[in-house]
Amino acid sequence: MIIYEEILREFQKQKVKYVIVGGIAVNLLGSLRSTADMGILVQMSDGNLKKVVTILKKKGYHVKQPVNPMGIADEKIRRDWIYNKHMKAFNFYKENSLEEVDIIIESPVSFRQAEADVLRIKIGNIVLPVISIDNLIKMKKNTGRSIDKLDIEELKKIKKLKEGLNDF
């Protein structure tokens, strides 16, 4: 069983519109990197966000922020969090576990852009929507974190390798 499999299966069952980003996406694209959290970029419709929040709560996840998690489904509240609280992601965690899910609410790559060239990667018998290398690099460029700088270098190497394989 892959980490987060229960959530990912439920997302699939409920037809949640999302794309995997962050460290797990880096792993799925071909780099070895230690990470325990899963970042997702989701379609920001109220209905889709309500599905995500409901699934995470049912699976035992809690919010780190001292706010009602259903607020993420309200566009006015989301905008307040982004502009007044400088929030970029909404974090859910599972007690006594390293598992965390970050719903990205502010990104240089929109869900629509990510979905346009999403990669579908099959792991076992589940197909995962994963952000493209180019879009993931765009997301990681302005974070200022050293891990993201390393990820960008790895992603560029993977892209170059894949382009080289396409020449054959």
Residue ranges and their predicted role:
Residues 1-168:
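Compositionally biased terminal segments of proteins
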